[in-house]
Each structure stands twice: as C-alpha cells, then as structure tokens.
Amino acid sequence: MKKLTLFIGLMALGTTSAWASCWQSNSAYEINMAMGRVVVSPDLPVGSVIATKTWTMPDNNTIYVTCDRNTTLKSDAKVVAAGLVQGANKVYSTAIPGIGLRFSRKGAISMIYPDSYTTTGSSFRLVGSTFTLDIIKTSTTTGSGTLASGPYTEYGPGFTILKTSLNADAITIVSPSCTILGGKNMNVDIGTIKRADLKGVGTWAGGTPFDIKLECSGGVSVSGYANINTSFSGTLATNTSANQGVLLNEKTGNSAAKGVGVQVIKDNTPLEFNKKHNIGTLQSQETRYITLPLHARFYQYAPTTSTGEVESHLVFNLTYD
C-alpha cells in the first residue's frame, strides 16, 4: 500500500515537471481602425472592396508572450464586436445596410478572421506582420452612417497580443446617388447650317443649348458629405485635343458630312474631355437638383468639308468622393 502510494506520487511529480510556464510579457498592441469618410460608388459591384487599410506592426521586436521552454500554443484570431454577423467568405455584416467588414493578418501565417493555428516557440512577437481591414459592398443598395465604436478583434497565442477597435466617428460610410432626370440617353438636335458658314479649320457655326438635369441624394450621416464630380468623354475629332471639346463625326456612308464635328461648350469655354469637373457638394441627408448647362455647335476640324449629316456621341460620367 505504501509502495502504491509512493508510485502515484512520483507519477504526479513527473507530470507536473513536464508542464511549461507561459506569461504575457507586454500588454497587447492596439489599433484604432480609423479610416475617416468612406464614399460608396453606386456603380460598384456587390462583393467589391469599397476601401481597405493595412497597419504594419511596429518594428521593435517586442516580445508579447514568453514561455520558459519551447511550447506549442494555439493562436486564435477572433471577432469580438457586438452586433456583427458572419456571412459568406468571412465578411461580417454591420448595422449599415450593404456594408460588410473583413479582417485579416499576414505574417509567418496568414489568416482571415476568425481562424486559428498552432505554433511552437518560447517567445511570441508581432514584428513583420500586418493587419488589414476591408470594407465590402454586400448588397446593391447601401446605407450611410458611422460604424459602431468599441472592440472588434483579438488575436494571440493563449494571451491576447493584438486588439483592434473603433473610436467614435472613426469610419463614416457615405452612399450618395444621382439620378439623371429624363433618362440616361439624350438626343440633342443642333440644327442646320450652310457649308459656307464654316470658314476653315478651327471655326464654328450654329448650335443649340441643352441641359443635363440631376436629382442627387446625399444619403450621409450628420458628419458626412459627398462631392459630386462629372467627366465627359467621346471620340475626339481628327487633329484636336481633349481641351478643345470637339467630337468626331461618327456618321458613315454617303450621307455623312466630311470634316465637320460637334464642339461642346460649358460656361462659354470648350468643354475639356476626360477631366474631373466638380459640380456640387451634398451635405447631411440633403437632396439637390442640379442643372448642368451646355452648348453644342458645328466645328470644322479638317481642311476639306462636304455637306451632309453630323452625328456624335458624348459620354457623361458621375463619380463621388
């Protein structure tokens, strides 16, 4: 009986001596994932990354967890934010409609939260790794507002060594939209001129004014805004540059006029193509009606002209920032 008792005691002692002791050497590194104002383009496909930001861990070789011998530990990457719901491809939906978040780390082991892996060592660091936040468009219609503040993720080998959070107003989502009144396609009849009205390359004649009318909704939070920008493009007329605003005659066949295109004018100046033009700013939950007045006229771009029809296409693009 005494031998049996002694044997059990020795076995227990041997088991205890095999255990490693690990402790947290330094407090967790913390990241405030501030990205400021993030504007969502209405034309962005569902599943696209709206915005992304990567943080590099400090290159100071800080040891966050220490063990008294080589030890195998399980490292967990967890999402701890309240109210987030995991969806497909580890994208978490937020309280803002159509807006999702994806969290990831890259280093010796790359992972998308939530995830885990085992690693062996006596000291555990963050140096050489990065943390990335992707903001994802999860539905066709997106809302606006500020992402909730508080803790979002935790990572570490048995002890938390990396934390991420958002402060108040750290990320504001802006989902503006503009509707072109009258539809996306517009036909402008610029009338008729005589061939003799054009006096040579670089001269113009005739023409008519036309308006592009927009109804724009800010769809932003109290602290948000959105700039509305437009750009114009088309096939440039021969021997002209983008700042002359002259479109090639795309009419073909025997009925097409030769050497004559269409010049577009804005504010009494040729409209520069492929350039961003700011046409307004939307404030909090504001709806604005914007009219963009333009003028189209005939323009001679070649030394030789002929009578006939002129047909050109102008492409109008809207962007937000």
Curated annotation (Swiss-Prot):
Name the UniProt key words of this record, in alphabetical order.
Answer: Fimbrium, Signal
Q: Which organism is it from?
A: Klebsiella pneumoniae
Cellular component GO terms held in the UniProt record: pilus
Q: Chief localization class?
A: other
Q: What is the annotated signal peptide range for this record?
A: 1-18
The record's comment on protein family reads: Belongs to the fimbrial protein family.
Could you identify this protein by its name? Fimbria adhesin protein
**Compartments where found:** Fimbrium
Q: Which PANTHER family match?
A: FIMBRIAL SUBUNIT ELFA, FIMBRIAL SUBUNIT ELFA-RELATED
Q: What is an annotated GO biological process for this record, any one? A: cell adhesion involved in single-species biofilm formation
